[in-house]
Amino acid sequence: MNVAILLAAGKGERMSENVPKQFLEIEGRMLFEYPLSTFLKSEAIDGVVIVTRREWFEVVEKRVFHEKVLGIVEGGDTRSQSVRSALEFLEKFSPSYVLVHDSARPFLRKKHVSEVLRRARETGAATLALKNSDALVRVENDRIEYIPRKGVYRILTPQAFSYEILKEAHENGGEWADDTEPVQKLGVKIALVEGDPLCFKVTFKEDLELARIIAREWERIP
């Protein structure tokens, strides 16, 4: 059984909106509904768990009617806490693999879902990633240090893992920027799957405007 964990518990403070960004509506759908739709259509996904804050349960319930949705789980104050809540909920389902995705990345393709899961079956863990094409610098005390961009990737989501591996990685708690970091500390090789720029994270108002433009054509994009 392959289960997608859709993280939608963030506060979206950098967006400066009245509601969390994952619940902002673009082209008739809330942001979280775009990746959810991809998971529901994907033959590689058997079930979906949506993680959000208690006060948004009713909103999500009204928007979600599908047999693949296994449940809505209350998220924590941090990303890692939300992932652990989902893993605990999934114990009774005994999934083989779980796929973790940020709801703030609305434009998820089915082919990436399938490929990340395929690579996770080979190594135990895989993540969507994008080669960096920009110049990179580190700034410290007003000094700029250039970082070689060869071999540098941007880590995206979705990220797929053996359920048992991800559960073990989170057993001792901790706070992580994503889930590949604690998994790698177990000595598990992380497979990288080449993504594309469409899988960007909506963080600022400018990102939301770009998302509106893409959403108008999203159903036509293969």
From Swiss-Prot:
Keywords noted in UniProt: Isoprene biosynthesis, Nucleotidyltransferase, Transferase
Protein EC: 2.7.7.60
Protein name stated in the entry: 2-C-methyl-D-erythritol 4-phosphate cytidylyltransferase
Site positions (Positions MEP for the nucleophilic attack): 149, 201
Entry keyword annotation includes Secreted: no
Species whose genome carries this gene: Thermotoga sp. (strain RQ2)
GO molecular function terms attached to this record: 2-C-methyl-D-erythritol 4-phosphate cytidylyltransferase activity
Coiled-coil region list: none
CDD domains with a match to the protein in the record: CDP-ME_synthetase
Disulfide pairings: none
Biological processes annotated in GO: isopentenyl diphosphate biosynthetic process, methylerythritol 4-phosphate pathway
GO cellular component, one term: cytosol
Xref: SUPFAM superfamilies: Nucleotide-diphospho-sugar transferases
InterPro entries, A to Z: IspD (IPR001228), IspD/TarI (IPR034683), ISPD_synthase_CS (IPR018294), Nucleotide-diphossugar_trans (IPR029044)
Record site feature (Transition state stabilizer), residues: 14, 21
Catalyzed reaction equations: 2-C-methyl-D-erythritol 4-phosphate + CTP + H(+) = 4-CDP-2-C-methyl-D-erythritol + diphosphate
Pfam families documented for this protein: IspD
Record-linked NCBIfam families: ispD (TIGR00453)
